[in-house]
Each structure stands twice: as C-alpha cells, then as structure tokens.
C-alpha cells in the first residue's frame, strides 16, 4: 500500500520572508516595552545613586587621632577590656587572619564604589574582585566646608553610564548679606546718574530708545513679510514686545506693535479658514512642502489667537480701570492704548471675516458699540456698518445680528440707538433684486430621456448627453456662491431683525430706540410677511395718535406705513387717508427757526405717498399738497425750499391738471380754507400759487430759478426750462447739494467790484470861506485850562430858565 502523500504545499520563498502585520506590531510593542523597562531601570539607578551620595555627605566623619596626643585613661581601660574579650589570634585560621589584615588595609567600611562608571545593578562576574572597587574611593579629611552636589545629566560610553555632578558651596548668611549690600550699592550707583539727567538729555535718550525699538519692529515685520512660512516664529518675538517694561517708551512701543501685528495678519493670512488636523491626518506621511505649510498654518493660528487674547486683556483692563503690578503704563495712557487695541479689532473684523476666531472678535466688538466713550462707540459702529456693506454672502452679518439682538434683549432695550441704526446697512435688498431676476431668467431645462428618444437619433442622443454633462460642469464651476445658501442666510438674518424691531414696538414704545426701529421698518417693510401688515399699520397709527412721538418719529411712522402699502400691500384693501391727513396738517411744523432735519424724511414721504401712488391719489389731494408745499417753501432754509420746489415740479408733471393753480381765476365751488386739516375738502382749486412771485425775489439764485420755472408751467424746453444738472436730480439730492451745514453758501457769493470811484475835491473840504476861516482859528487856538464847576453851571442855567418862564 502506498504511503499517504502530504497534501500541504511547501511555502514559497516570498511567503517565508513575508512577515505578518500582527508579528510586526508585536515586535514594535516588545521593543517599546524594553525601552520603557530600560528607562525605568535607569531612573531607579539614578535614584539610588543620589540617595547614596546624600547618605555619604550627611555622615559626619570621625576625625583622625593625633598619635602624639595622650588618650584618656578610661578609654585606654575600655580598649584593654575589649582586647581581652576579643577572640585570640591563635584560635583563627591563617586564611581568616590574612583576610582581616587585607580588609584593614583596604578600608572596606564603604559599601559602594561612588567613582565607578558602571551601573548600580550590574551583574557580578567571577573574575572581578569586589574589594578592588572600594580602593577607588578617596578618603579625605573634611577640613573644607560642606558642599552640596548638583546632579547633572549622565554620560554614557562603552564602559556604561557615568553620572555627572557639580559641587555647590554652602553660602553663609553673612556672605548673602554682603552680596545683597553689594547689589544695593550697585543699584544706587546705577540710579544716581539717571537722576542727574536733565530734561533735554532725558528726551534725547527716549528718542534714541524709541528709534531702536522702531528699527527692531521694522526688521521683524520685513522678515515676516518677505517669507512668512520660514519666519513664522518671529511673530512670537514681535508679539513679546507687547510686554515692553521700559516706562519711557512702553506706551508708544506697545501701540506700534499692535498696529504692526494687525497689518501683518491682514497681509499673511490665507483666504480660507484653517481647521485643526484629525488624528488620521497627523499620522499619515506627507511631503516636506506640505509639512512646512502645516507648520505655518498652526503657528499662524496660535499666534493670531494669542494676539487677540492680548488685545482683549488690554480692553478689559481699561474697562475695569485696572493697572498691572509693574505700573509701567499710567491709567491715562492706558485709555489711548485701549483705543488702539479697539481700532485693531475693528480692522480685523472687517478685513478677515472668513478667518478663524471671527465670532470671538464679534463678541468683543458688540458690547463696545454701547460703550460710554463716544470715540470707541463710533469706531465699533462704523466697523459693523462697513462689514454689513461688504458682506456678499451674509454669513458674517448673521453672526453680528445674532449677538446684537441678544445684547439688546439682555440690556432690556437700554442701549444706544446707533446700534440699531447699523441694521440699515444690511445688503438684503440687493439679494432680493437678484432673486427676482433669476426668477425671470429661469435656468435652461434639459431634455428628458423620453423626449430625446422621440426627437433624436441614437448618435444625437449620445452627443446630447455629453453636451449636457459639460454644461452642468461649467455651471458648477461658474457658481462661486450658492444663491440658495445666500437666500437662506438672509432670510434668517431678516427674521432676527424683525423680531428685535417688534419686541421694541411692543415693550419699549417710549424708548429712544423707536426712531431707529421705525426707520428700519421703513427700509425693510417690503420684505415683511403680508400677514403682519394689518397689525403693523394699526400699531403705527396708534403711535401717531398717542401724541408722545416727536415730529421726526411720526414722519418715520408715515414713511413705514407707505413703504408697506407700496410693496406687497397693494393687494390689500386699506385706506391710508389718516396718514395723508397727518402729514398734511404737520407740514407747517417745519420752519427756518429750527433745524430742517425733518425735510429729508418729508421729501421721502411725499415721493412714496404721491409720486409712486399716482393712481390712488385724487386730484383734490394733489392740489392741496402742491399749495401747501409752496407756502412752506417761504418759511424754510434755502436748501429746503429747493427740495420742496423740486417736489412741486414733479407733482405738476405727474398731475398735469394742477396747472390751474397758475391762474388767478377762481371757480364757484367754494373758498379756499388754508387752515383746514383735511386735504380733500380745503377747496385748493379756488386759490393760486402767489407764493411763487415772492420766491422769484429770493436771495438764493437757485430758488429764484425754480420759482420762475414753475411760474412758466414747468416746461421741458425753452428759455424757462431748467438746466440738466437741476432737472435730472431728485429732490433729496438737491436738498443735500445745496445744504449749508458746512457754513458755506452754494453757489458762492460773488464779490461786488464797483466801477464808481469816490472823488475828493483838492484843497479845503468846505466851499464857504468864512466857515473855513472859523475852523482854522479854533483849531490853532489853545484851549484855556479852566476848572469844571458843575454846580455853578447848574445854578446859572436854572436862573436863566426862571427868567425865561416869568417873561
């Protein structure tokens, strides 16, 4: 019978040399375990070595006896007794006796060889002699003072580990006191020349120090800008100068460093957010260039974080009126330092909205918008406005709006109105316009498979598929920002804004924030949901009727109401007559004796109420408003008169039948009632615009030009037509152009150069010769010096008066 053949295949050479992953891992673990055990052994040896050295130092050596000195009698007797009790030498073996002699000569009382280079727990070999090690230990008299050993890092060579130590002499108290006295003397010597410096020398020395610091800052900044990846560590060196301790230049140097670091971060920061690396990314092998980039990003983020923490600490110390222990910077100078820190934070808020820690900057800036210091508050508000204006996507704006809304609610609506006025700079309106255009121009629709099968051949379908694929890829490449994401962010932002506005309308109607709220509602009213229109109009009318609002606040209410009605509110059946009546009766509140700040709001309201709602405005209402605007133009400042006359011109073009106000003939429908508060029933058709004749003699040339133009019927052509720079501008633009807020007259007043010259007669001024002679005689004569006697003159005059009375 055949022997059974082994079916196992002989392993190949490749399999023999191949090592499994488990084996490799086990090998690695064993290697690490051995290294750890070796380290533990080494630490144990070092611990024992230090303990042995301490024991050897702490033992007090017995001083050697002088053979010449006489020993005391008692000690001699005790030694004799010990000798008697000791084992006699004749009873010991020769080997033991020889060993005792050797031990006595070789000083075997030490247990360890301190000078040996071998480890403590080294294995003993047979050929080594234990006694020979102890001979290496020196025996010296301790006549010198005790010295403490400082243990250093050991050295390892072929023979083993060599411990290293250094002696530290024990200093006495007297030596320490002498050293302190020497230091004090040196300090006094150093301080003496400083006190002797004059003011001029002190200023020169400060300039020199400051110049050196400026050169150092410039050198570091230039090195970082030249190659940020290689010199990222110099950011730390530059940031360390924020802790300048020299009181002469501390404030200036810190300000320069803050500004320099801010500009550096704006220049070298990448245009993306740096995220922390995962464990898997850290463990993978990468190229040198990638590793260098990672190190740069990590260093940049860490230094940027520390820089922001330093700025936050400066602002916090200033707010809490704290000073550092060193007292290098005074409290007065700390305010300027804090303002520079706030300015840097504002710059970073605007310049780096995409980078790390942007939300942290927002949390720092928003409370400072409500700060008691006006420069700081204005600086922060301007930075937030700038961020809103340039934020295209809306991510940064949403973060700021969330923090502001929470801050206003947390302060119970007791904040500066400027905080809410920043909402007016949001770019939500522009996105809505883009959305409308995208709805009109819908994207191209691709053909379905069934449509392709019906109309195209097999080859055409293949080409069509490839073409559609390319079009999709091109569309994805061109779309840099997602419109859907943009609309989503702006919708969320708008919801938070309206929630803040409605809270203030509901809970804080007497708050100084109300004008800002009404102004914001007027701007974003077209974006409010239609469901809230009725309730919002009722609230606005209630606020107007309450009488607690100022004139400008009531105008904001009117403007908001008509913005609501001019947008989606066209579909609602709401009669805004009460708002027309309120504006008509309050127009005469404006006059030249007060500031004309409300004129701009009035011009906006008239544009929304009359020009844009021309189909809903009756003929009688248009006539009444034109008559009242011309009357108002007589009692306001020139720029306000120009704006009102420009609005009158637009209304005369919008409502052509209003030219009957230029005739002096009246109709038989009644008498004009100028004091009536209802514009519909004041019979404005029975009056004329006599105010224009008065305005033709106004001292301002532009007012005169507009008055003449309106009297001629506001023609578009001819001699009475306006110039293009006047006719093409809106009423608000003309009001701002000819404003005299800068205390300058526009157009400038021409200096009068009269051609007539005053003629003087040669010789005497008077033609009468007798009069000239009399004047010369009295001018040449010297006046007699007579004393003044008022009593005598009074008696003579009274006596003369009596005589005249009797006669």
UniProtKB/Swiss-Prot annotation:
Q: Which GO terms describe its biological process?
A: fat cell differentiation
Q: Where is the composition biased (Basic residues)?
A: 40-51
Tell me if Coiled coil is a UniProt keyword of this record: yes
Sorted UniProt keywords: Coiled coil, Isopeptide bond, Nucleus, Ubl conjugation
- Positions bearing the Glycyl lysine isopeptide (Lys-Gly) (interchain with G-Cter in SUMO2) cross-link: 332
InterPro entries per UniProt: ARM-type_fold, CCAAT-binding_factor, Noc3_N, Nucleolar_cplx-assoc_3
Disulfide partners: none
Q: Which family does it belong to?
A: Belongs to the CBF/MAK21 family.
Its annotated function is as follows:
May be required for adipogenesis.
> What is this protein called in UniProt?
Nucleolar complex protein 3 homolog
Tell me what organism the protein belongs to. Answer: Mus musculus
Gene of this entry: Noc3l
């Amino acid at each position: 019978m055949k022997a059974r053949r082994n079916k196992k295949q002989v392993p190949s050479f490749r399999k023999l040399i191949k090592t499994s992953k488990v084996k490799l891992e086990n090998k690695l673990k064993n290697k690490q375990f051995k290294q750890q055990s070796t380290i533990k052994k080494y630490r144990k040896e070092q611990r024992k070595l230090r303990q042995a050295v301490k024991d050897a130092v702490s033992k007090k050596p017995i001083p050697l006896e002088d053979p010449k000195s006489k020993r005391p009698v008692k000690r001699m007797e005790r030694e004799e007794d010990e000798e008697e009790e000791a084992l006699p030498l004749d009873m010991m073996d020769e080997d033991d006796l020889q060993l005792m002699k050797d031990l006595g000569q070789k000083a075997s009382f030490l247990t360890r060889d301190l000078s040996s280079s071998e480890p403590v727990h080294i294995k003993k070999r047979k050929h080594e002699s234990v006694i020979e090690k102890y001979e290496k230990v020196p025996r010296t008299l301790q006549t010198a003072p005790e010295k403490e050993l400082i243990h250093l890092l050991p050295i390892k060579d072929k023979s083993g580990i060599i411990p290293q130590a250094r002696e530290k002499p024990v200093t006495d108290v007297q030596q320490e006191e002498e050293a302190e006295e020497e230091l004090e003397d040196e300090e006094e010597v150093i301080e003496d020349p400083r006190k002797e410096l004059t003011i001029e020398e002190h200023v020169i020395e400060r300039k020199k120090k400051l110049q050196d610091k400026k050169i150092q800052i410039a050198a570091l900044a230039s090195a970082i800008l030249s190659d940020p990846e290689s010199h990222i560590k110099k950011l730390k060196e530059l940031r360390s100068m924020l802790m300048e301790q020299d009181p002469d230049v501390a404030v200036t140097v810190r300000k320069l460093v803050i500004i320099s670091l801010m500009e550096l971060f704006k220049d070298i920061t990448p245009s993306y957010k740096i995220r922390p690396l995962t464990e898997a990314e850290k463990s993978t092998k990468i190229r040198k260039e990638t590793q260098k980039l990672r190190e740069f990003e990590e260093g940049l983020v860490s230094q940027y974080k520390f820089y922001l923490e330093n700025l936050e600490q400066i602002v916090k110390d200033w707010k809490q009126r704290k000073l550092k222990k060193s007292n290098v910077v005074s409290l007065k100078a700390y305010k300027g330092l804090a303002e520079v820190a706030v300015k840097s934070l504002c710059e970073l808020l605007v310049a780096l909205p995409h980078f790390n820690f942007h939300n942290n900057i927002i949390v720092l800036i928003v409370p400072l918008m409500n700060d008691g210091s006006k420069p700081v508050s204005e600086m922060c508000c301007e930075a937030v406005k700038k961020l809103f204006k340039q934020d295209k996507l809306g991510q940064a704006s949403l973060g700021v709006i969330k923090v502001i809304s929470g801050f206003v609610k947390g302060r119970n609506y007791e904040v500066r109105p400027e905080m809410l006025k920043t909402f007016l700079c949001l770019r939500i309106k522009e996105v809505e316009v883009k959305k409308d255009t995208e709805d009109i121009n819908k994207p191209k629709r691709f053909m379905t498979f069934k449509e392709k099968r019906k109309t195209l051949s097999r080859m055409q379908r293949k080409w069509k598929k490839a073409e559609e694929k390319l079009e999709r890829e091109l569309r994805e490449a061109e779309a840099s920002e997602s419109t859907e994401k943009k609309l989503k962010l702006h919708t969320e932002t708008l919801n938070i804004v309206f929630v803040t506005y409605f809270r203030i309308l509901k809970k804080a109607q007497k708050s100084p924030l109300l004008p800002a709220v009404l102004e914001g509602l007027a701007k974003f009213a077209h974006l409010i949901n239609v469901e809230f229109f009725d309730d919002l109009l009722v609230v606005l009318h209630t606020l107007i009727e309450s009488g607690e609002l100022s004139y400008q606040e009531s105008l904001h209410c009117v403007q908001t109401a008509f913005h609501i009605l001019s947008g989606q509110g066209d579909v609602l059946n709401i009669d805004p007559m009460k708002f027309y009546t309120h504006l008509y009766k309050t127009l005469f509140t404006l006059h030249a004796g007060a500031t004309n700040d409300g004129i701009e709001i009035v011009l906006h309201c008239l544009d929304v109420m009359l020009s844009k709602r021309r189909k809903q405005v009756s003929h009688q209402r248009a006539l009444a408003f034109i008559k009242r605007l011309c009357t108002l133009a007589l009692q306001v400042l020139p720029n306000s008169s120009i704006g009102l006359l420009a609005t009158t011109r637009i209304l005369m073009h919008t409502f052509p039948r209003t030219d009957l106000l230029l005739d002096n003939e009246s109709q038989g429908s009644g008498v004009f009632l100028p004091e009536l508060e209802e514009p519909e029933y004041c019979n404005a058709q029975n009056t004329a615009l006599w105010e224009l004749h008065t305005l033709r003699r106004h001292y301002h040339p532009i007012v005169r030009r507009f008055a003449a133009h309106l009297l001629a019927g506001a023609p578009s052509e001819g001699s009475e037509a306006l110039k293009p720079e006047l006719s093409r501008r809106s009423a608000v633009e003309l009001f701002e152009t000819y404003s005299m807020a800068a205390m300058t007259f526009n157009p400038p007043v021409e200096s009068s150069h009269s051609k007539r010259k005053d003629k003087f007669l040669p010789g005497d001024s008077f033609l009468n010769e007798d009069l000239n002679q009399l004047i010369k005689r009295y001018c040449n004569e010297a006046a007699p010096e007579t004393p003044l006697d008022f009593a005598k003159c009074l008696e003579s005059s009274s006596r003369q008066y009596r005589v005249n009375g009797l006669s």
